[in-house]
């Protein structure tokens, strides 16, 4: 006989279902479950007296007969593709199927087979997201990787060689020798990594050798001279070799203004870093490029969101990051030209409109590597509080806003850098780089992080406890050690390097995957973040207008996902 139970009872047993709503952390963001791919009355759940037992929810099928390696049961997926409930089957380190798990011999509608060789991760009452991607990394110290991973980032892309002064200021791993050493160093870390070569040159040979050596992209930075000639040369190499170009434009406008830079780019695809300008770029109007079809605009997180402390802290950061001297007036003027509260305020609103497409960190070089995800959701919260619900929302929820913001650190950087066939979303066929969250801790502290289908870090209690008891904090797990590390994580390289056998040549232990499809894309390919307003910046007051509308908002004095989550 069918039985009926209350929604609250059902949610406590199997997690929320279609029509249920829940709050993300302590923010004002509320999501609603759009659909449920599991079957009422046939849900699978692990535990004493539960469903996943021999002959019940667990079949006799072997791995060779299609049983999964791992099943995440009853998870609430939050992704750019939607907000929905499902079981997720993992095989060979990838997402094999999203649907209904169980035993096809005893249950109807099963498309994810649980067998004797299947591990279970309980997703009931938890949120499942794709692992984040941080596409603006200065590899200044290896300890960044731990902080990033434990925040929910599973892919880091950038450049550097350690605390050399070139790396402290620019995201470049210059030259084949340094690229080779960094690719070898990547073998030590349980995270996907990709390295950017230096893109500043007026002749192509020095750039081509870096791409062949394994650089997955090239970085143009003003500290190396981002002249029109360097821009044109770098993009020409990128077009021939299918790698992305990132640009930090000329703050001092020495070699031209923003219009000259756009002319040098010539309609070719480019990823514009810290497009608001506090992190660097044509002062005061680099923000104009958000309206260009070929430019993928991104933010770095120190200006996200605009708060009471944002402007004050930036001057000191600039002096350190760009090797400036407070005793030199020109250095101070350089720093002050970049910090404009008007453009910082406009940046929040442009993100909410979907005009900025990506959020990243700028790690230790005016950015906080462990706060990409937290600051994304703080910004979404701030905009909900200050601007209200988005016009495109339907129902009493913030689903559209949540999908827009999660795309900024998952699918959009993956598309921008040619990695979206492998990472960036919770979709079948992609790598099982996944993050599980308790809703109350969403955006602050992940519960589990999986890389290539294996748990690499998790909230864990006292190892000497009879059960995992307090204190709980994020610790590395078995996927972060030994040969499992090399099987779980990958290093992304250029197609030219992959074809040249860079893995064998350098005796890399991690697998390598080639980037692809970076040149025939643009703003229109950025999921849920495609808006292209016409931007005007007043050169005297720095006021920003989008399609004639003044963009301004107040700084917040208090944020969610902050001190109450990080007492120790």
Swiss-Prot record:
Q: For this entry, list what GO says about its biological process.
A: urea catabolic process
Q: How is it modified after translation?
A: Carboxylation allows a single lysine to coordinate two nickel ions.
The broad enzyme category this protein falls into is: hydrolase
Highest taxon above the source species: Bacteria
Q: Where is the Urease domain?
A: 131-568
Cofactor(s) of this protein: Ni cation
Q: Would the keyword Cell inner membrane turn up in this protein's UniProt record? A: no
Which residues are recorded as binding Ni(2+) 1?
136, 138, 219, 362
Enumerate the Pfam families for this protein: Amidohydro_1, Urease_alpha
Keyword terms, alphabetized: Cytoplasm, Hydrolase, Metal-binding, Nickel
Q: Name one GO cellular component term.
A: cytoplasm
One example of the protein's molecular function in GO is: urease activity
Question: Quick one: where is this thing mainly located?
Answer: cytoplasm
Q: Which reaction does it catalyse?
A: urea + 2 H2O + H(+) = hydrogencarbonate + 2 NH4(+)
Which pathway does it take part in? Nitrogen metabolism; urea degradation; CO(2) and NH(3) from urea (urease route): step 1/1
Where is this gene product found? Cytoplasm
The UniProt entry's sequence similarity note says: Belongs to the metallo-dependent hydrolases superfamily. Urease alpha subunit family.
The identity of this protein, by name, is: Urease subunit alpha
- Species of origin reads Cereibacter sphaeroides (strain KD131 / KCTC 12085) (Rhodobacter sphaeroides)
């Amino acid at each position: 006989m069918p039985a009926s139970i209350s929604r609250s009872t059902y949610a406590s047993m199997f997690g929320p279902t279609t029509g249920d709503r829940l709050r993300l952390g302590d923010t004002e963001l509320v999501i609603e479950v759009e659909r449920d791919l599991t079957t009422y009355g046939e849900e699978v759940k692990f535990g004493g007296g539960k469903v996943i037992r021999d002959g019940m929810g667990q079949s006799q099928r072997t791995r060779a007969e299609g049983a999964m390696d791992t099943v995440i049961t009853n998870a609430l997926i939050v992704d750019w593709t939607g907000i929905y409930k499902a079981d997720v089957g993992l095989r060979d380190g990838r997402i094999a199927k999203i649907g209904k798990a169980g035993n096809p011999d005893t249950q109807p509608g099963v498309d994810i087979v649980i067998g004797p060789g299947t591990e279970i991760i309980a997703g009931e009452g938890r949120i499942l997201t794709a692992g984040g991607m941080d596409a603006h990394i200065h590899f200044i110290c290896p300890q960044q990787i731990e902080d990033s991973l434990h925040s929910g980032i599973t892919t880091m892309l950038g450049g550097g060689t350690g605390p050399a002064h070139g790396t402290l200021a620019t995201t470049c791993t210059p030259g084949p020798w340094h690229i080779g050493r960094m690719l070898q160093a990547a073998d030590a870390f349980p995270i996907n990594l990709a390295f950017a070569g230096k893109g500043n040159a007026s002749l192509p040979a020095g750039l081509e050798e870096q791409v062949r050596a394994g650089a997955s992209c090239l970085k143009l930075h003003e500290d190396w001279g981002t002249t029109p000639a360097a821009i044109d040369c770098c993009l020409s190499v990128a077009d021939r070799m299918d790698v992305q170009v990132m640009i930090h434009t000329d703050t001092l406008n020495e070699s031209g203004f923003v219009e000259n830079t756009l002319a040098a780019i010539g309609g070719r695809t480019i990823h514009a870093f810290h497009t608001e300008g506090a992190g660097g770029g044509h002062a005061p109007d680099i923000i104009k490029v958000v309206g260009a079809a070929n430019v993928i605009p991104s933010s770095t997180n120190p200006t996200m969101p605009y708060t009471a402390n944002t402007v004050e802290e930036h001057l000191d950061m600039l002096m350190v990051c760009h090797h400036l001297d407070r005793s030199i007036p020109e250095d101070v003027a350089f720093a002050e030209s970049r910090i404009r509260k008007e453009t910082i305020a406009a940046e929040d609103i442009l993100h909410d409109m979907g005009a900025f497409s990506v959020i990243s960190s700028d790690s230790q070089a005016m950015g906080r590597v462990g706060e990409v995800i937290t600051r994304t959701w703080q910004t979404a919260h701030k905009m909900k509080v200050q601007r209200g619900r988005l016009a495109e929302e339907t129902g009493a929820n913030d689903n559209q806003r949540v999908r827009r913001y999660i795309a900024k650190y998952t699918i959009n950087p993956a598309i921008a850098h040619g990695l979206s066939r492998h990472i960036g979303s919770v979709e079948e066929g992609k790598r099982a780089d996944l993050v599980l969250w308790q809703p109350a801790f969403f955006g602050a502290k992940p519960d589990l992080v999986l890389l290539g289908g294996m748990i690499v870090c998790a909230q864990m209690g006292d190892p000497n406890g009879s059960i995992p008891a307090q204190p709980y904090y994020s610790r590395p797990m078995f996927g972060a050690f030994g040969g499992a590390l090399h099987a779980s994580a990958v290093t992304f390289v250029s197609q030219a390097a992959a074809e040249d056998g860079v893995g064998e040549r350098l005796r890399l232990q991690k697998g390598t995957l080639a980037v692809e499809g970076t040149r025939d894309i643009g703003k229109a390919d950025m999921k849920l973040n495609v808006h292209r307003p016409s931007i005007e910046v007043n050169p005297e007051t720095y006021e920003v207008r989008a399609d004639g509308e003044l963009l301004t908002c107040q700084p917040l004095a208090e944020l969610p996902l902050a001190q109450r989550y990080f007492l120790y």
